[in-house]
Amino acid sequence: MKYLAAYLLLVQGGNAAPSAADIKAVVESVGAEVDEARINELLSSLEGKGSLEEIIAEGQKKFATVPTGGASSAAAGAAGAAAGGDAAEEEKEEEAKEESDDDMGFGLFD
């Protein structure tokens, strides 16, 4: 991810085709370790893909087809909230019992 971020920074900075050395320099400038094999893998995967805008647009199309599962997570959230409410009531009862046990007629400053 850090190599992709460095690539994007270089492109936004005006370098239309960043090299491995350019990416390495950006990553090293922040004190991060560099894996040149990963940089070369990134550059080879981006080679021939077109402009950065085209790559982002293609990725957005792919994400649009992925189901998010929002309905199932909403149902799980509601069930969790109901269970959480019961736990809160039990906790209040336990606190009340503990408070009555602590007060045995002894005052702190007596």
Swiss-Prot record:
Acidic residues compositional bias, start-end: 87-104
One annotated Gene Ontology cellular component of this protein: cytosolic large ribosomal subunit
Modification after translation: The N-terminus is not modified.
Main location, first listed in the record: cytoplasm
GO biological process, one term: cytoplasmic translation
Keywords: Cytoplasm, Isopeptide bond, Phosphoprotein, Ribonucleoprotein, Ribosomal protein, Ubl conjugation
InterPro entries for this protein: P1/P2_N_sf, Ribosomal_P1/P2, Ribosomal_P2
Sites bearing Phosphoserine, chain numbering: S29, S100
CDD domains: Ribosomal_P2
Region (Disordered): 66-110
Crosslinked positions (Glycyl lysine isopeptide (Lys-Gly) (interchain with G-Cter in ubiquitin)): K49
Keyword Ribonucleoprotein in annotation: yes
Assembly notes: Component of the large ribosomal subunit (LSU). Mature yeast ribosomes consist of a small (40S) and a large (60S) subunit. The 40S small subunit contains 1 molecule of ribosomal RNA (18S rRNA) and 33 different proteins (encoded by 57 genes). The large 60S subunit contains 3 rRNA molecules (25S, 5.8S and 5S rRNA) and 46 different proteins (encoded by 81 genes). The 5 acidic ribosomal P-proteins form the stalk structure of the 60S subunit. They are organized as a pentameric complex in which uL10/P0 interacts with 2 heterodimers, P1A-P2B and P1B-P2A.
Functional summary from the UniProt entry: Component of the ribosome, a large ribonucleoprotein complex responsible for the synthesis of proteins in the cell. The small ribosomal subunit (SSU) binds messenger RNAs (mRNAs) and translates the encoded message by selecting cognate aminoacyl-transfer RNA (tRNA) molecules. The large subunit (LSU) contains the ribosomal catalytic site termed the peptidyl transferase center (PTC), which catalyzes the formation of peptide bonds, thereby polymerizing the amino acids delivered by tRNAs into a polypeptide chain.
Protein name: Large ribosomal subunit protein P2B
Organism: Saccharomyces cerevisiae (strain ATCC 204508 / S288c) (Baker's yeast)
